[in-house]
Amino acid sequence: MNALVRRCVARAGLPCIWRGKCYSSGNEPAESNQVTPMLRHLMYKIKSTGPITVAEYMKEVLTNPAKGYYVHQDMLGEKGDFITSPEISQIFGELLGVWFVSEWIASGKSPAFQLVELGPGRGTLTADILRVFSQLGSVLKTCAISIHLVEVSQKLSEIQALTLAEEKVPLERDAESLVYMKGVTKSGIPVSWYRDLKDVPEGYSLYLAHEFFDVLPVHKFQKTPRGWREVFVDVDPQASDKLRFVLAPCATPAEAFIQRDERREHVEVCPDAGVIIQELSQRIASTGGAALIADYGHDGTKTDTLRGFYGHQLHDVLIAPGTADLTADVDFSYLRRMAQGKVASLGPVEQRTFLKNMGIDVRLKVLLDKAGEPSAKQQLLGGYDMLMNPQKMGERFHFFALLPHQRLHGGSQERNACQSKTPSSSVAGFDELVWQ
């Protein structure tokens, strides 16, 4: 069996629950009522200073340096709490690799580019993209490519290093260095690790954020007869070892994030996502490139989407904090507003539409023709179904892009967010392509 087919088949056989499977605030039966170190930390914090916002709760639970979920655990894959698209099929990463090469060509073939991934998981997606770069070596031979990974988890950065470099990459000894790990991939491309996007060197860059924005902390608000009230996390007075949601008695500063014409009864807002989008927009407007964001979410229509995942099952977000992943749907309308017209935005489009436009059917046929065994073909089709089926990932995940205005409209002036949605130039994945 062809080596590429074997890699694809191996991933297609994984059992999967995707984090966008359903929308829940986390009221399902909990897997565990244990008093975790994180729960003790949070209860002490709340008893000392008062109830905390949902955003602060998520930040502590996921990224606390001592007890955070993402800091020390490998939560991906069959033994983790969820599986992502790159873990299901290599076709996914290959098509994204083609997208980045397509944008590099369309923007004028810069002599150098940085591939920057935010939250790279196990490094699987970057590895698949790099394999495409190697296969297109004749096209990219004059381009100096470097990889820059933004990762807060030391555990995951070590796994990424093994995936990309096939060896352990030592930590940088210079305490003042913005890079905390540096190495070379199997194909000879330099790779560096950072803890913050702002630490990545500026220059022509292609940015990738796959299932990254959904784990950023959100503020939750509920409309009441007295106006908007923010949702907080407090200690349950009926059970000293449990937490509960409460409403703030009065307005809070974060209420400023709510749109004046908001009509929903419940709203989730992610200021951190806005800051990152503004940083990406400024960089792309100044030095060129593009950003591709793939996540599950909505275009300003959904309400209460915060939920937890533990062992591939839905998990109450307030039970055993620090042991389960917390996630909330991405509001793409908010991301579009935060770009502030500095760059053009495309999408969101459903994953099945994007992948079909990128030629997933053509690529699947090639792999099926090379897979001689019936079981291998069945697994390839299973992976395809998981990515494309509307009831699975096909309609739940969406793609969204940021591009320079001149890439779409032939001008350099800033435009407002509405204008950026109607490009005059075709962009792979977001426009239907004719395959010969």
Curated annotation (Swiss-Prot):
Residues 1-41 form a transit peptide. Keywords: Methyltransferase, Mitochondrion, Transferase, Transit peptide. Its EC number is 2.1.1.320. Disruption phenotype: Embryonic lethality. GO terms for molecular function: enzyme binding; protein-arginine omega-N symmetric methyltransferase activity. It comes from the Eukaryota. InterPro entries: NDUFAF7, NDUFAF7_sf, SAM-dependent_MTases_sf. SUPFAM superfamilies: S-adenosyl-L-methionine-dependent methyltransferases. Residues 411-436 are annotated as: Disordered. Belongs to the NDUFAF7 family. Interacts with NDUFS2. This is Protein arginine methyltransferase NDUFAF7, mitochondrial. It comes from Mus musculus (Mouse). The lineage of its organism: Eukaryota, Metazoa, Chordata, Craniata, Vertebrata.
